[in-house]
Design a protein with these regions (language model features):
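Conserved short loop/turn motifs at secondary-structure junctions
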Residues: 39-40, 116-120, 200-209, 219-224, ...
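C-terminal or mid-to-C-terminal helical accessory/interaction module adjacent to the motor/catalytic core
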Residues: 23, 49, 70-154, 197-204
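Intrinsically disordered, low-complexity regulatory segments
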Residues: 1-97, 106, 402
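Core structural elements
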Residues: 95-107, 124, 152-156, 203-215, ...
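A generic secondary-structure signal for well-formed alpha-helical elements
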Residues: 54-59, 106-110, 192, 239-248, ...
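Long, highly charged, low-complexity internal segments
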Residues: 1-13, 121-236, 271-276, 305-425
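Conserved nucleotide-binding/hydrolysis micro-motifs of P-loop NTPases
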Residues: 40-44, 68-73, 154-159, 250-254, ...
Length: 429
């Protein structure tokens, strides 16, 4: 890179690739037309441009085609719609590449001296390490605080304990120490409890969008225990076998054909009321959206042959894609307030009842369990003023927790939120 000459890059062919280049040049010279079918994003466009340059191709007559899935229809359509190389994408890739080299060449020697030889520092790697270090410092400096929370299991005042009819509720007040908590428990022992209020609110839950590279990596980590690198290796095999669309993408869009096929499948399998066609807006700050979202090439195929990991990942992609085009789930969220006759402290119970399962019939998105449990309890039917008995009331000491260390999934999520890196960089990083 010639920094003094407007950062002009100079490219060299590696010695071990000279034979391949020679063979390609001969094949190109013997051909009437050369078709370049590298990926549609800026990295793929740069590859096409480098090939044209090395093979000394006439850009005006060279056919540039792109497709996002290895199917007969997709390839045929690409051949019918060739275009020229997009130099805007090429220049964009060159700028990123030059920045990568400048950052790496400047920082890596410092690592060799201060840490150990052969370490590398990249534009994305360095930021990822910084995030991990900052989180570790937060954990080290965190000071835990304790309190006591009181929870009770209540049930309607009937002659016997009804099965599956208990209400788990938590006291609205937190107690500073064991002495305060014990005093409150002594107050609860002879107390009379009743339902002082009920709030019922209808609500909906919407499906997650189809997978991008980063969301596939995150969900495969949560649901399947796959590392980021493992996910990309398995996805590559599925793509090369023509089972899924291109696996390096930051788009959540589906093609019109995919939407039609998915809708037909949902109506046939689950009925019209379960179908809701929708497109999702990509949230990533740096999204190129050169491709579709990651989806099955044939939505009607719910399973594939292959290794167990390939089957698992395909099923995950299939379910997520189908669910994204299904109706919202309809829920009823209930809050029950329980009062006591000898204290202003109330107990609160919350629960959720699914009235219509919608997309949940097929798929439910996982989340990083960094903030504790997120269970949805089904509450028994009660009325305001109804007397309640308690089965148990206990006090538990709780400690505030430091922020958790990043997992591979949560680190990828953070990088994406900050607009750092591209789908192709997350696995190597």
């Amino acid at each position: 890179i010639d920094i003094r000459n407007n950062f002009s890059p100079e490219y060299e062919i590696p010695k071990d690739k000279a034979k391949i280049v020679s063979e390609l040049r001969k094949a190109a010279s013997d051909s009437k037309t050369v078709w370049l079918a590298s990926d549609e994003d800026r990295e793929g466009e740069s590859i096409a441009w480098h090939l044209a340059s090395v093979l000394k191709l006439d850009l005006a007559s060279t056919r540039r085609i792109v497709f996002h899935e290895i199917t007969k229809d997709a390839i045929s359509n690409a051949i019918l719609n060739p275009r020229q190389i997009d130099m805007n994408l090429v220049n964009s890739q060159q700028a990123r590449r030059i920045l990568d080299r400048i950052v790496g060449f400047e920082i890596s020697p410092v690592l060799w001296k201060k840490v150990q030889p052969s370490l590398s520092a990249g534009r994305v790697q360095s930021v990822a390490v910084r995030l991990i270090v900052e989180r570790e410092r937060e954990i080290i400096s965190f000071k835990s605080e304790s309190s006591f929370r009181v929870t009770g299991l209540f049930y309607p005042d009937t002659s016997e304990l009804p099965e599956n009819n208990t209400i788990r509720a938590e006291a609205s007040k937190k107690f500073r120490d064991d002495k305060e908590a014990t005093a409150f428990l002594e107050l609860c022992a002879p107390a009379e409890f009743s339902v002082s209020g009920i709030t019922v609110k209808p609500g909906t839950r919407s499906p997650a969008p189809p997978f991008t590279t980063s969301t596939l990596q995150q969900e495969a980590y949560r649901k399947l225990g796959f590392s980021v690198a493992q996910t990309m290796t398995v996805a590559q095999k599925l793509y090369e076998a023509g089972k899924i669309t291109y696996m390096r993408t930051d788009s959540t869009n589906l093609s019109k054909l995919a939407l039609t096929k998915t809708r037909e499948l949902i109506i046939a399998e689950y009925g019209e009321k379960y179908s809701k066609t929708r497109q999702f807006k990509t949230r990533s700050k740096s999204a190129q959206e050169a491709h579709e979202a990651i989806r099955p090439t044939y939505p009607e195929t719910s399973s594939v042959t292959g290794s167990q990991n390939e089957k698992k990942l395909y099923e995950l992609i299939w379910k997520r894609t189908i669910a994204s085009q299904m109706s919202d789930a309809e829920v009823e969220r209930t809050t029950i307030l329980i009062g006591m006759n000898n204290s202003p402290v109330t107990f609160t119970a919350t629960g959720e009842v699914i009235k219509f399962d919608g997309f949940l019939k097929v798929y439910s998105e996982s989340t990083d369990t960094e903030n504790g449990e997120d269970e949805k309890y089904i509450l028994p039917k009660v009325e305001k003023g109804m007397n309640l008995l308690y089965e148990t009331i206990t006090a538990t000491q709780k400690f505030t927790s430091p922020p958790p260390r990043y997992t591979e999934a949560s680190l990828v999520k953070k990088l994406e939120e900050l607009g750092i890196g591209r789908p192709s960089t997350y696995a190597p990083t």
